[in-house]
């Protein structure tokens, strides 16, 4: 089995802790926890609870799994003949629509790749049902690789542990990823004119010699007006700070570029909204009910992941000259960070 590509190690400045760069992510599983904690504004507790990911999975908050990604080229067992490649290709496509399946009949391989949520569906339901399609050693390596990337999402089955106590496959994979993690430098963060942070948390290497990739961003300090537009790009994956769980008292906001009189009216209105929200919370109104009055100008943070076609669509749509200025500025930064020159509206 050949791994199609490896996962880049992200390094991040935590906006809630300080401005100094810190190596927060040791393995891709850490990106999942970070995305989950963004929802609850609990990033200061990052990596303090070993079972955080298990809790997320147990309550089926599975969107955070979509921030992890893995891909493999698998050898199909030759005993099934040439037609087996097409058979397995169609079987996998029908059963696992959220995994991306590529057919490489000349190389006698099938490419399987997708986010950790798609892999988790396969892992939880019926890994054994595809066991016979591929070589036993390949399947063992696939399971061990996924486990090394996200051990709390893909725990190694007990039967495989006993079979591989002295097996070098897992050790080699672990050392390979550890070397890649140690070789990364710095983090990539840009600040918009309104003070929002655009952070590239991670990006895969090119997939099998193509221009395909998977990337994860965090947008911090953007308005809800921007995030409402962002989530329209449904092919991407999102984990957003929750107004249901995060208290909105004295919320910050983003002012649009309007005339001074309008700005003063906006500020006065937001001051009134803040007072009403605070009064409701003092009367023990739940956050999930009090949030009904929070405006689109309220600041939020969101983690966004996706493959190259999702990011390109976002770039093409949101860098257009008639795009809303706040999201256009973010999209232009994303385009530059990704080095994606295929967007139709370069600045």
Put a short name on every predicted segment.
Residues 1-347:
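Family-specific signature for flavin-dependent thymidylate synthase
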